[in-house]
Amino acid sequence: MSEQNRLLLIGGDGVGAEVVHEAGRIAQWFAARRGLPLSIGQAAFGVEVLNRTGRIMTDDTLAQIRAADAVLFGAIGGPEYDRLPLEQVREEGLLRIRRELGLYANLRPVRYWPALAELCPFVPERVEKVDMMIVRELAGGIYYASPRGIDQTGDGRRVGTNTQRYDDLEIRRIARVAFELARARGGRVCSVDKSNVLESGLLWREEVQACRDAEYPDVELEHILVDNCALQLCLRPARFDVLLADNLFGDILSDAAGAVAGSLGMLPSASFGAEDGGRRRGFYEPVHGSAPDIAGQGIANPLGAILSLALALRWTFRQPAEADLLERAVERALAGGARTLDLLAGAAAPALSTRAMADAVLQALETLAA
């Protein structure tokens, strides 16, 4: 890596600040012990900033985000947001960041952790080979399209409206991400839609198929209706390699698939836009939310954030060997019995604090790197 590899840490709300802090310690280990020339910065975001400035995100933070190669983000959310206009949350929160960075692809790897078998609701034989990548379209669909809003009719009734809309270029753009990933993995893509009742779903199916036929004939493509996909994720999750879905379906299915990991605290994610001069700038975050009920207690699971750092090492900083090392260290820490409260499954062993869990990963890194 060059000297210009800039990692920006943004804790955000609730437990986000705690888990990102620990992931930052891991990043510092790679800089100090592995010689990775990382420039690590921090920026404020969320309720802390809101209380000081009346805004969720300042212009300075947005400028730092634009300048970073990779952003490791914690969480946004909490009761304070309930009193804010929805438009302010859209314009100053994650949707603004996604728009500013041109993020359109959200990747969520889902795998089975043998050390957490007791937490997984599936029998091991059904999930032990699960290693899937969920590719979610992030910039379009029902979360963004217009018209939208809550209106009142002439007879006094209230009506809520949202619009599901995709064009061919948006669909092919995200399809290429899935097909490229499949080429480097098992060579299989399963595309999710609701083409039997939605015109947007029919276009999705047609364009994904056309993209595959024209550009990726070597990749196996299957189409599946979203309701059947939800069922198959419960019955045969190991059948999926790369799962491609639109914004809404991808949002829902990725959380459902996360049950394989045993805890939302184990799930990382990455979001990308177009490559910039051969570099893939990324926005990385654990899937779990801000968890205000446990914020400030030092008991949150930092592994989702730490595994998100591994994704940054792999995809933005192009250090796959270092990413593999970090993922093996997480696996080793878990195999050695390291558990935060969400990973105990009723066991008698004491729960580790957020910091102690990160310490267990650091110890595993030292052992594996020796």
UniProtKB/Swiss-Prot annotation:
Q: Kindly report the protein's main subcellular placement as a broad class.
A: cytoplasm
The main enzyme category here is oxidoreductase
Residues recorded as binding substrate, renumbered to this chain, are: R98, R108, R136, D227
Identify the residues that bind Mg(2+).
D227, D251, D255
Q: Name one GO cellular component term.
A: cytosol
Quaternary structure annotation from Swiss-Prot or TrEMBL: Homodimer.
**Function summary:** Catalyzes the oxidation of 3-carboxy-2-hydroxy-4-methylpentanoate (3-isopropylmalate) to 3-carboxy-4-methyl-2-oxopentanoate. The product decarboxylates to 4-methyl-2 oxopentanoate.
Please state which protein family the record places this protein in: Belongs to the isocitrate and isopropylmalate dehydrogenases family. LeuB type 1 subfamily.
User: Mind telling me what this protein is named?
Assistant: 3-isopropylmalate dehydrogenase 1
Organism of origin is Bordetella bronchiseptica (strain ATCC BAA-588 / NCTC 13252 / RB50) (Alcaligenes bronchisepticus)
Lineage here is: Bacteria, Pseudomonadati, Pseudomonadota, Betaproteobacteria, Burkholderiales
Q: Which gene encodes it?
A: leuB1
